[in-house]
Amino acid sequence: MRKEEIIERYSRIFPKASRVTYAPIVAVKAKNAKVWDIEEREYIDFLSDAAVQNVGHNNEKVVKAIKEQAERLIHFTFIYGFTLEPLLLAEKLAEISPIEEPKIAFGLSGSDANDGAIKFARAYTKRRTLLSYLKSYYGSTYGASSITGLDFHVRALVGELSDVHYIPYPDCYRCPFGKERNSCKMECVEYIKAKFEGEVYADGVAALFAEPIQGDAGMVVPPEDYFKRVKRILDEHGILLAVDEVQSGLGRTGKWFAIEHFGVKPDIITVAKPLGGGLPISAVVGRAEIMDSLPPLGHAFTLIGNPVASRAALAVIEEIEEKDLLKRAEKLGSYAMKRLGKMKEEYELIGDVRGKGLMIGVDLVKDRETKERAYDEAKKVVWRAYELGLIVAFLQGNVLRIQPPLTIEKETLDEGLDKLERAIADVEEGRVGDEALKFVHGW
């Protein structure tokens, strides 16, 4: 079957609400950091399936766990009975969590995990108001989309949860308060205090939802002491801190959870994407008293705690431990940041390089002074990278998303960075025509 036919059939059967594409790759095989398409072309994957493949595509340990479990028991519903696999996984998550003696509720996606976190936070505090960040992304289910700070136009069509308020995220490259790093007085923290003195009754707020590093906003890393200052304000008013580690968790930034970089302990953590190694599974990890605040079946789905997905997830965590992938992510991330920093010196198109571990953003701009986002140029870079055999995407329309598997070989990382540099050079020097714009959509 031809690639073009498959893509055309996709457009006929799947709604646009379910997908957004960057390149016409019909994948048929993958291993570690490489993907092969239906035409037998090889690609280096700098996207990790949208930050899913932390331990690499088709990881041998994960595949073995799936096969063994599928031969023995595929499913026995968690909500009515008992199986060993989700228990072992939950105990392992509790072990690596920065929350002491937590309880864990399983789900199927990051979206439903964040929906669950909303329910647990409101039930425990008996408060309704929620705080979230502008440009945040928590998922596409009803609750998760209600606290998402990106403008998707979805809420205007379908409605949203009430009592949600937004605050600016501390973006030091494009400061929402117009400050520079050397003149910053943490106005982003003072804004929260002012919010509580004005339109929001602080003692009615259940939780602040936060990404420790804003992923889909363009890999935005906050100042090191930001969350410490915010947590002090929250604690004064009995407000919970719920952190979304769906994209940043399980070693991606060089820590089990990205929030650990900032020296605070959250009350609730949501985990998903890389947890199942490609299988659908998520978790809400929270303080026991918070997690016990909902009644029986208050956050339950028929397929949660699936033995196959649980066994795969346990294998993912074991692989991260056994191969010391936290240290590897930190080391390779530091190396990649240095190489990308050198590219920034060479190419005016690169305005900023930021990130932690192997969660990196390359901010493309039309002008370094104005920081005007280079939307068309980003599309052209992604297209040229595809032609060169590199899978890369962008966020916010202009920030290249660099998130290869934590298991990527050093030489493969270098090869991918070489391809990326060539793509950027070709775009900057005008060697990629406007016809590329009609092929790349993204968001």
Curated annotation (Swiss-Prot):
Concerning PANTHER family, the annotation shows:
AMINOTRANSFERASE CLASS III, LEUCINE_METHIONINE RACEMASE
Q: Which UniProt keywords apply?
A: Isomerase, Pyridoxal phosphate
Q: Which domain of life is it from?
A: Archaea
Q: Write down the SUPFAM superfamilies for this protein, in alphabetical order.
A: PLP-dependent transferases
Q: What does this protein do?
A: Amino acid racemase with moderate substrate specificity. Is primarily active toward leucine, which is the preferred substrate, and methionine. Also exhibits lower levels of activity toward phenylalanine, alanine and serine.
Name the protein family: Belongs to the class-III pyridoxal-phosphate-dependent aminotransferase family.
Which residues hold pyridoxal 5'-phosphate? 110-111, 247, 302
Q: Specify the protein name.
A: Leucine/methionine racemase
Residues modified to N6-(pyridoxal phosphate)lysine: 273
Q: What organism does the UniProt record list as the source?
A: Thermococcus litoralis (strain ATCC 51850 / DSM 5473 / JCM 8560 / NS-C)
Q: Which molecular function terms from Gene Ontology are attached?
A: identical protein binding; isomerase activity; pyridoxal phosphate binding; transaminase activity
Q: Which reaction does it catalyse?
A: L-leucine = D-leucine; L-methionine = D-methionine
Q: What does the entry report on temperature?
A: Optimum temperature is 70-80 degrees Celsius.
